[in-house]
UniProtKB/Swiss-Prot annotation:
Xref: CDD domains: M20_DapE_proteobac
GO biological process, one term: diaminopimelate biosynthetic process
UniProt-recorded name of the protein: Succinyl-diaminopimelate desuccinylase
Free-text remark on how the cofactor is bound: Binds 2 Zn(2+) or Co(2+) ions per subunit.
Protein's pathway: Amino-acid biosynthesis; L-lysine biosynthesis via DAP pathway; LL-2,6-diaminopimelate from (S)-tetrahydrodipicolinate (succinylase route): step 3/3
Keyword check for Cell inner membrane: no
Binding site for Zn(2+) 1: 68, 101, 164
EC number: 3.5.1.18
UniProt keyword terms in alphabetical order: Amino-acid biosynthesis, Cobalt, Diaminopimelate biosynthesis, Hydrolase, Lysine biosynthesis, Metal-binding, Zinc
Binding site residues for Zn(2+) 2: 101, 136, 350
PANTHER family associated with the record: ACETYLORNITHINE DEACETYLASE (PTHR43808), N-ACETYL-L-CITRULLINE DEACETYLASE (PTHR43808:SF31)
Entry cofactors: Zn(2+); Co(2+)
Entry keyword Transmembrane helix: no
Length: 377
């Protein structure tokens, strides 16, 4: 049995070693298909990152498929059962780096749009693609830069599906209609270095910071809401000391991270942290990194269209969740866009032997096409 159009394109994309921020010709392959459909292509290169914006139509609403062609490194090749860049089907599963995250989705998007335009050449509104090779990297020169460019010329995305692997057990069982925000703090508590035998003429920043850190970990930041769990505070990194057993360190460095709901704000969290540190009379420096703001699409045409499309294909409505890490959807949501994530099962993403069910790719293609039918036919 010959490969389907979706599987053929997926294999072609997966055979290209596009480890972030490399694209390895994936975007060129997609652009060729989109040009044939009448899309206008705008390639946007920012430093080491290749992006493209493709649009068909000039009317509202503007619907966008967003995704990335880059993949994470393979890890140890000896741990893979197959070559990660030679897509291989075993027992109905397609194995390759990027199969689930997210070249499989890209193939589904392209084929769904080809089918939709074939059936509805004079469709309503506008179709577009926002594709980057920087999602798995530092996310500095990718989607966020394209969004800035679009905003500068007032080209605003109304609705967007991000092809991130949202599903858990089977394709479409979960769609993400929002994501938590991420805020990182880099705290340096200052002490006075000295000999451990003379603590009275030194000041131990580890000891000084312990009460404040404990209080930070015990604080209830908010209660969450119907869509988000309560905001969480975690300390992923701590560093202090010289390595010697007889030296009180001069500084203690603590990195902490909030994953926060729409019930909290960056400014509110920052203010509460500063007040707590000051209450404990710490001498410190504190730098902040806003990794992303929370977003939520709890109503609107896109949510309805996606839920109905999944129900049509699966005979069951999806669960709406906001769990997991951040995605490029956070940048697009800043435009005021409705944003939904719908993609393959995420059980093997970033792991060795990453894979996706071949049948799931066909179902996902049908879901994407049905969304377009619901919105723009």
């Amino acid at each position: 049995m010959p490969d389907t159009p979706t599987l053929t394109l997926a294999k072609d994309l997966l055979s290209r070693q596009s480890v972030t921020p490399e694209d390895a010709g994936c975007q060129e392959l997609m652009i060729k298909r989109l040009k044939a459909l009448g899309f206008t292509i705008e390639i946007m290169v920012f430093e080491d990152t290749t992006n493209f914006w493709a649009r068909r139509g000039t009317e509202a609403p503007l619907f966008t498929f967003a995704g990335h062609t880059d993949v994470v490194p393979t890890g140890s090749l000896t741990q893979w059962n197959t070559d990660p860049f030679e897509p291989t089907i075993i027992d109905g599963m397609l194995y390759a780096r990027g199969a689930a995250d997210m070249k499989g989705s890209l193939a589904c998007m392209i084929v769904a749009v080809e089918r939709f335009i074939s059936e509805h050449p004079e469709h309503k509104g506008s179709l577009s693609f926002l594709i980057t090779s920087d999602e798995e990297g530092p996310f500095i020169n990718g989607t966020t830069r394209v969004v800035d460019t679009l905003k500068e010329r007032n080209e605003i995305i109304d609705m967007c599906i991000v092809g991130e692997p949202s599903s858990t057990q089977y394709v479409g069982d979960v769609v993400k209609n929002g994501r938590r925000g991420s805020l990182t703090g880099n705290l340096t508590v200052k002490g006075i270095q000295g000999h451990v035998a003379y603590p009275h003429i030194a000041r131990n920043p580890i000891h000084q910071s312990m009460a404040a850190l404990l209080e930070l970990t015990m604080t209830e930041w908010d209660l969450g809401n119907a869509y988000f769990p309560p905001t969480s505070f975690q300390i992923p990194n701590m560093n202090s000391g010289t390595g010697a057993s007889n030296v009180i360190p001069g500084t203690a460095e603590i990195m902490f991270n909030f994953r926060f709901s729409t019930e909290s704000t960056v400014e509110g969290l920052q203010q509460r942290v500063i007040e707590l540190l000051d209450k404990h009379n710490l001498e410190y420096d504190l730098d902040w990194i806003i990794n992303g703001l929370p977003f939520l699409t709890d109503t609107g045409d896109l949510l309805t269209a996606v839920v109905d499309a999944v129900a049509t294909v699966n005979q069951q409505k999806p669960e709406l969740l906001t769990t997991g890490g951040t995605s490029d959807g956070r940048f697009i949501a800043q435009m005021g866009s409705q944003v939904i994530e719908l993609g393959p099962v995420n059980a093997t993403i970033h792991k060795v032997n990453e894979c996706v069910k071949v049948d799931d790719l066909e179902k996902l293609t049908d879901m994407y096409q049905e969304v377009l039918n619901n919105l723009l036919a």
